[in-house]
């Protein structure tokens, strides 16, 4: 694997990191040789004095290194104590890696290493944000590089909240600046299977016991013994429960307790689909009333999506009926949502109810503690569930290592119990705040109302007046103010605890130079769309049956009219309708955008935008139209077309081509 260039800064600027140069630290070897010939001089002279002083300095430094090596040797010898880990998910494997790197003897017990918590390969990718990637770097830089190379960067693009019906931006998230300003890796998504394979390979086959389900444990005060489902028993010095939201270790510690149902069921799937704005947008959260939809680029020409809907737990769909129900739930939503559903195969869709667990004030007892979902399972809305488990893993390994060092210095037994308490205390507040944020994000996403009248039953007619809902206006004001500080703390608030990790940004993480412009200018962001533009016949009464492809040649004019014109040098769209004039309208492409100009037609040209507002185009004045708009040539709706933008895919990707054909047929 080729090395990746790094940009290091000893004193990084809080506002900007230089991505233009590469600085590399050269580690100092413990075994070093110095040429002392330059210090030779006359005995008793200044040069001789300096020579003796330099030699003494070297001897002192050598003695210090030898003392440190002896201390490390003693420490490594004492660290042959055993750490038991229940659960081989992300949290369990990352902690096992961290503990192993610190010199501990680790054993991981997992009931089914191939299942990814029972949801198989279709559960898809997981988002690893900057804070977790930095913690992983502090644990093992080589493993972190493998993860980052295998992942798809989303933090270098626009991410945020949009209106589910219109698809217009509500709030944009800047996850790049907090990472770059603090010298952190940029957020990525990676396949769970790939991530688990990388971690398992780094931990080692000799450490992981597959098909080993921990059902009980015994804490004698000096040792901990785990009991497997098959009756086997293993003894160690401490036990870490990383066995997920339904943790058996947690139940045995504190008694059985019910997880908290979020009120939402979640459908999820992966589609072979490339959006037209893939270069500029990483992920979106589409907001709605009592439902919301999340889509994210996961690399390799694939998109992952989650569809949340408020309903009681325990529901089920008819056989092969999930896709049909999703179209019913999200009927009338924007093309960004519907296109993904169309492109997803029925068998690639999973459904699960969403639960979480409140962290609580006590994470463990005696020589047993908990980590990740087993103590603070979160709703997926912040994308921080796995990230918090990785942070937990680093901190727990650090506290155990500090306890060993203290025992070596004081020649006293290792205080395992106190080290576990310190781990819990150091993590409790941050985890509780982010856990609460995840719950709040779910509430905000599902109670969103674009217009006054939404969700008001008999008063729903008010929505036709398009009066912005007060909650929408106030919510946006609050989010605009609070979001930058919140993201800065979530992504960078733990970085100061990552001992031994210098602030650094990978040169390959550099964002597009236009990123700041995209944040501030929706129009500039929209012009980054790359795809073919189509006019698709709209409505049962449309007099045209074929789909029309628009040209993006700025030098070739395009005229819409009722009669062909052999002498016309440009593109001619002929619509045989009584309300379409001979020279009805002109379509213009300029600087990445399409415009429509009515040529003083008798019956006019009308545009209905993605928020449902219909207006008549002013004659001889170019009017911008966008994807999902409805264009009517004449007022009788017999020449109505829906604007559609579809990414142009390589001819070799037949599956994507068939998806594009499917989108054209179903639009």
Curated annotation (Swiss-Prot):
The keyword S-adenosyl-L-methionine belongs to this UniProt entry's keyword annotation: no
Binding-site positions, FAD: 82-110, 360-373
Compartment(s) of residence: Plastid, Chloroplast
The EC number(s) this enzyme carries: 1.14.15.21
InterPro entries, per the entry: FAD-bd, FAD/NAD-bd_sf, FHA_dom, SMAD_FHA_dom_sf, Zeaxanthin_epoxidase
Cofactor(s) for this UniProt protein: FAD
Keywords: Abscisic acid biosynthesis, Chloroplast, FAD, Flavoprotein, Oxidoreductase, Plastid, Stress response, Transit peptide
Induction, as annotated: By ABA and drought, salt and osmotic stresses.
Broad class of where this protein is predominantly found: plastid
PROSITE patterns, sorted: FHA_DOMAIN (PS50006)
Catalytic activities: all-trans-zeaxanthin + 4 reduced [2Fe-2S]-[ferredoxin] + 2 O2 + 4 H(+) = all-trans-violaxanthin + 4 oxidized [2Fe-2S]-[ferredoxin] + 2 H2O
A UniProt-annotated Pfam family: FHA
Transit peptide as recorded in UniProt: 1-59
Knocked-out gene: effects: Increased endogenous level of zeaxanthin and reduced level of ABA. Reduced size of leaves, inflorescences and flowers, early flowering, increased number of wilted plants, premature seed germination and reduced osmotic water permeability and ability to close stomata. Reduced susceptibility to virulent isolates of P.parasitica and sensitivity to BABA-induced priming.
Example GO biological process: response to red light
GO MF: FAD binding; zeaxanthin epoxidase activity
Impact when changing residue 125 to A: In aba1-3; ABA-deficient phenotype
Biological or metabolic pathway of the protein: Plant hormone biosynthesis; abscisate biosynthesis
Residue stretches making up the FHA domain: 558-612
Chain segments annotated as transmembrane: none
Entry's Gene Ontology cellular component terms: chloroplast; chloroplast envelope; membrane; plastid
Function: Zeaxanthin epoxidase that plays an important role in the xanthophyll cycle and abscisic acid (ABA) biosynthesis. Converts zeaxanthin into antheraxanthin and subsequently violaxanthin. Required for resistance to osmotic and drought stresses, ABA-dependent stomatal closure, seed development and dormancy, modulation of defense gene expression and disease resistance and non-photochemical quencing (NPQ). Through its role in ABA biosynthesis, regulates the expression of stress-responsive genes such as RD29A during osmotic stress and is required for normal plant growth during vegetative development.
Miscellaneous remark of the record: Plants overexpressing ZEP show increased levels of violaxanthin and ABA and increased tolerance to salt and drought stresses.
Name of the protein described by the UniProt record: Zeaxanthin epoxidase, chloroplastic
Native source organism of the sequence: Arabidopsis thaliana
């Amino acid at each position: 694997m080729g090395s990746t260039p790094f940009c290091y800064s000893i004193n990084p600027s809080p506002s900007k990191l230089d991505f233009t140069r590469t600085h590399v630290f050269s580690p100092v070897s413990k075994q070093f040789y110095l040429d002392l010939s330059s210090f030779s001089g006359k005995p008793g002279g200044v040069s001789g004095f300096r020579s003796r002083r330099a030699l003494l300095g070297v001897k002192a430094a050598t003695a210090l290194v030898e003392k440190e090596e002896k201390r490390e040797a003693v420490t490594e010898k004492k660290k042959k104590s055993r750490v038991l880990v229940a659960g081989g998910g992300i949290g369990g494997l990352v902690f096992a890696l961290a503990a192993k790197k610190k010199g501990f003897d680790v054993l991981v017990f997992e009931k089914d290493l191939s299942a990814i918590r029972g949801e198989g390969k279709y559960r898809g990718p997981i988002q690893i944000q900057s804070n977790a990637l930095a913690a992983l770097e502090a644990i093992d830089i080589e493993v972190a590089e493998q993860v980052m190379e295998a992942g798809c960067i989303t933090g270098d693009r626009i991410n945020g909240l949009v209106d589910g019906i219109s698809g217009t931006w509500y709030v944009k998230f800047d996850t790049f600046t907090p990472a770059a300003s603090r010298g952190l890796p940029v957020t990525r998504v990676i396949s769970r299977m790939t991530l688990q394979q990388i971690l398992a390979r780094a931990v080692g086959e000799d450490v992981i016991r597959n098909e080993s389900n921990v059902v009980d444990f015994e804490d004698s005060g000096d040792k901990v013994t785990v009991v497997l489902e098959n009756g086997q028993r293993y003894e160690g010095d401490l036990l870490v429960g990383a066995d997920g939201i339904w943790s058996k270790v947690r139940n045995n510690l504190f008694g059985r307790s019910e997880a908290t149902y979020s009120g939402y069921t979640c459908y999820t799937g992966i589609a072979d689909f490339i959006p037209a704005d893939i270069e500029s947008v990483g992920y979106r959260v589409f907001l709605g009333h009592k439902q919301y939809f999340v889509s994210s680029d996961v690399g390799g020409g694939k998109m992952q999506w989650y569809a949340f809907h408020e309903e009681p737990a325990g529901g089920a769909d008819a056989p092969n009926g999930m896709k049909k129900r999703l179209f019913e739930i999200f009927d009338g939503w924007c093309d960004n949502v519907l296109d993904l559903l169309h492109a997803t195969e029925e068998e690639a869709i999973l459904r699960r109810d969403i639960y979480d667990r409140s962290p609580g004030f006590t994470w463990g007892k005696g020589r047993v503690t908990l980590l990740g979902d087993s103590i603070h399972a979160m709703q997926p809305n912040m994308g921080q569930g796995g990230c918090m488990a990785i942070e937990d893993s680093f901190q727990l390994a650090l506290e155990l290592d500090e306890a060993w060092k203290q025992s070596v210095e004081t020649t006293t037994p290792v205080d395992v119990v106190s080290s576990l308490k310190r781990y819990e205390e150091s993590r409790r507040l941050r985890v509780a705040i982010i856990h609460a944020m995840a719950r709040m994000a779910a509430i905000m996403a599902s109670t969103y109302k674009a217009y006054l009248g939404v969700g008001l039953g008999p008063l729903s007619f008010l929505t036709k007046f398009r009066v912005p809902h007060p909650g929408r206006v106030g919510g946006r004001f609050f989010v605009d103010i609070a979001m930058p500080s919140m993201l800065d703390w979530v992504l960078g608030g733990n970085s100061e605890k990552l001992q031994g990790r210098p602030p650094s940004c990978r040169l390959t993480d550099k964002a597009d130079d236009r990123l700041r412009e995209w944040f501030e200018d929706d129009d500039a962001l929209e012009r980054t769309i790359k795809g073919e533009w189509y006019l698709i016949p709209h409505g049962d009464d449309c007099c045209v049956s074929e789909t029309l492809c628009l040209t993006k040649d700025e030098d070739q004019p395009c005229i819409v009219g009722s009669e062909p014109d052999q002498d016309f040098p440009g593109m001619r769209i002929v619509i045989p309708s009584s309300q379409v004039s001979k020279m009805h309208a002109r379509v213009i492409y300029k600087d990445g955008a399409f415009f429509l100009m009515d040529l003083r037609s008798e019956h006019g040209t009308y545009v209905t935008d993605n928020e449902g507002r219909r207006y008549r185009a002013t004659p001889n004045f170019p009017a911008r139209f966008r994807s999902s708009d409805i264009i009517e040539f004449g007022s009788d709706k017999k020449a109505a077309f829906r604007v559609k933008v579809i990414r142009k895919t390589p001819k070799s990707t037949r599956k994507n081509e068939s998806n594009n054909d499917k989108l054209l047929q179903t639009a």
